[in-house]
Amino acid sequence: MSMATIARPYAKAIFDFAVEHHSIEHWQNMLAFSAQVSAHKQVTQWLSGVMHSEKTAQIFISLCSDHLDEFSKNFIKIMAQNGRLSLLPEVLKQFMALRAMINSVIDIEVFSAIPLNEDQKKKIIFALEKRLQLKVTLNCKIDESILAGVIIRHGDRVIDGSVSNRLKRLKNFLLS
């Protein structure tokens, strides 16, 4: 079974709990910190060792105590009992995906040769939100190889409005 498949029910359970208790931000922060702790090299080695789950939970909770309330501690105990503390980074990833879905927000990558100004970003966001009927956040990256224009990417969808792409198409047309 993949890590995502195993992590999904944990993420769904705590996401539903967080929504019900109006504490999504708290749970995301707790998961982010706990996932960072569990991904630390020494902690990863320790988690892979054989140890009683109650003791594992106690030690892990003590490492993260400033970021945990009673509900979070219970969640960590359940994860430890099931030997799943090493999955916290994947649980966080799934939790954030659920949060994005409920807010109908999608993250779009935009590649440009130079940094986009705020007006350009607003125009791109407006056009994409109108087309996709979802709230859009941009993840802007610089790629000087495109020369000018932008490449917009979401999942397997790509809108290539770059000069380098236009030059390639012109070259192919002239060679044919």
From Swiss-Prot:
Q: Principal localization?
A: membrane
- What family is it from? Belongs to the ATPase delta chain family.
Q: Which HAMAP family match?
A: ATP_synth_delta_bact
**Cellular localisation:** Cell membrane
Q: What protein is this chain from?
A: ATP synthase subunit delta
One Pfam family cited in the UniProt record for this chain: OSCP
Q: How does it assemble?
A: F-type ATPases have 2 components, F(1) - the catalytic core - and F(0) - the membrane proton channel. F(1) has five subunits: alpha(3), beta(3), gamma(1), delta(1), epsilon(1). F(0) has three main subunits: a(1), b(2) and c(10-14). The alpha and beta chains form an alternating ring which encloses part of the gamma chain. F(1) is attached to F(0) by a central stalk formed by the gamma and epsilon chains, while a peripheral stalk is formed by the delta and b chains.
Indicate yes or no for the key word Ion transport: yes
InterPro entries assigned? ATP_synth_OSCP/delta_N_sf, ATPase_OSCP/d_CS, ATPase_OSCP/dsu
Biological role: F(1)F(0) ATP synthase produces ATP from ADP in the presence of a proton or sodium gradient. F-type ATPases consist of two structural domains, F(1) containing the extramembraneous catalytic core and F(0) containing the membrane proton channel, linked together by a central stalk and a peripheral stalk. During catalysis, ATP synthesis in the catalytic domain of F(1) is coupled via a rotary mechanism of the central stalk subunits to proton translocation.
Q: Give the source lineage, highest ranks first.
A: Bacteria, Pseudomonadati, Pseudomonadota, Gammaproteobacteria, Enterobacterales
MF terms (GO), sorted A to Z? proton-transporting ATP synthase activity, rotational mechanism
Which controlled-vocabulary keywords does the entry list? Answer: ATP synthesis, Cell membrane, CF(1), Hydrogen ion transport, Ion transport, Membrane, Transport
- Which domain of life does the protein's organism represent? Bacteria
Topology with respect to the bilayer: Peripheral membrane protein
Q: Which organism is it from?
A: Hamiltonella defensa subsp. Acyrthosiphon pisum (strain 5AT)
